[in-house]
Design a protein with these regions (language model features):
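Glycosyltransferase-associated regions of secretory-pathway enzymes
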Residues: 19-21, 62-66, 201, 211, ...
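A short, well-structured edge-of-sheet supersecondary motif
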Residues: 2-34, 39, 78, 203, ...
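Active-site-proximal alpha-helical segments within enzyme catalytic domains
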Residues: 45, 104-111, 145-167, 174, ...
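Penicillin-recognizing serine hydrolase domain
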Residues: 132-133, 153-156, 160-194
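Active-site Gly/Thr loop motif
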Residues: 142-145, 151, 177-237, 271
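Active-site helix/loop module of the DD-peptidase/beta-lactamase fold
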Residues: 38-42, 46, 54-90, 94, ...
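Structured C-terminal helix/loop/strand segments within mature extracytoplasmic catalytic/sensor domains
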Residues: 221-271
């Protein structure tokens, strides 16, 4: 795919990308594939996946109480527990608003650690990184934004998201479906979205505009982007996933080039 070469025009020093088909094959890649990049909020995808493993293993349940009074694991994953973005203050009743929250993911990890008896970084490492051979990925930092990884490690994770081996496919399908539909909210860097649909840790594109995915991305596209200049999306209708990691913080440059890049990848794939 020649479209991956578009990253050469991005105003960044180091960048890499990989495109992964639904059968788990890396069909195209370009740039710094083994460089370790900070993931920022793309970390939430790994945290959410480990949390879902904990659910399937019975360490926690999606409807177990967690966080503010009346909130559950499900609320924390879907950014509807009512927490502020960065402070442990409650701004809304559970389920009333979609407030994107790093704190919610920190509380999620603390809850799983408490109930499993294993610190969350170790749990995530053994539950996700080891079986997927993500040997260059580190999840010892903040579960909301502190992981680091490589393009090729995240390509393995993108393959897992499309053809799950660690979770039942039904669990991943639920995670990639809207939870608490109809709630408005803000996608950082892209403003208020009505509605701001989210799954169990996965942001869902639906009809959001503007957005970090492409105009040609299907409404079912899910994934996450990070303020460190990173993203991972899965488009179930295109049967394709894409990872891009860079070393320049998100800003207007990314809001401009990422959608164009995604549309080019999808267009070439569909030809």
């Amino acid at each position: 795919m020649r479209s991956v070469e578009l990253i050469e025009s991005w105003p960044v020093e180091n960048v890499g990308t990989a495109v992964v088909s639904s059968d788990g094959q890396v069909v195209a890649s370009h740039g710094d594939l083994e460089r370790v990049f900070p993931l920022a909020s793309v970390s939430k995808l790994l945290t959410a996946y480990a949390a879902l493993v904990a659910v399937e293993e019975g360490a926690v349940g999606l409807d177990d109480p967690a966080g503010p009074e009346g909130a559950t694991i499900r609320h924390l994953l879907a950014h509807t527990a009512g927490y502020d973005f960065s402070e442990r203050t409650v701004r809304a009743a559970p389920g009333d608003r979609r407030i994107y929250s790093n704190v919610g993911f920190e509380v999620l990890a603390e809850t799983i650690a408490e109930r499993s008896g294993i610190d969350f970084a170790s749990y995530a490492h053994e539950a996700v990184l080891v079986p997927l051979a993500m040997t260059s990925t580190d999840v010892s930092g903040s579960p909301a934004a502190g992981a680091s990884s490589t393009v090729m490690d995240l390509a393995r994770f993108a393959a897992e998201l499309q053809r799950p081996t660690l979770l039942h496919p039904e669990t991943v399908a639920e995670a990639a479906s809207v939870v608490f539909p109809g709630l408005d909210g803000v996608v950082p860097g892209f403003g208020r979205q009505r509605p701001n649909d989210w799954g169990l840790g996965f942001e869902i594109r639906d009809g959001k505009s503007p957005h970090w995915t492409g105009a040609q991305s299907s409404p079912r596209t899910f994934g996450h982007f990070g303020q460190s200049g990173t993203f991972l999306w899965v488009d179930p209708e295109a049967q394709l996933a894409c990872v891009a990691l860079s070393d320049r913080d998100f800003g207007p440059w990314a809001a401009e080039v990422w959608p164009t890049f995604t549309d080019a990848v999808l267009a070439e794939h569909r030809r």
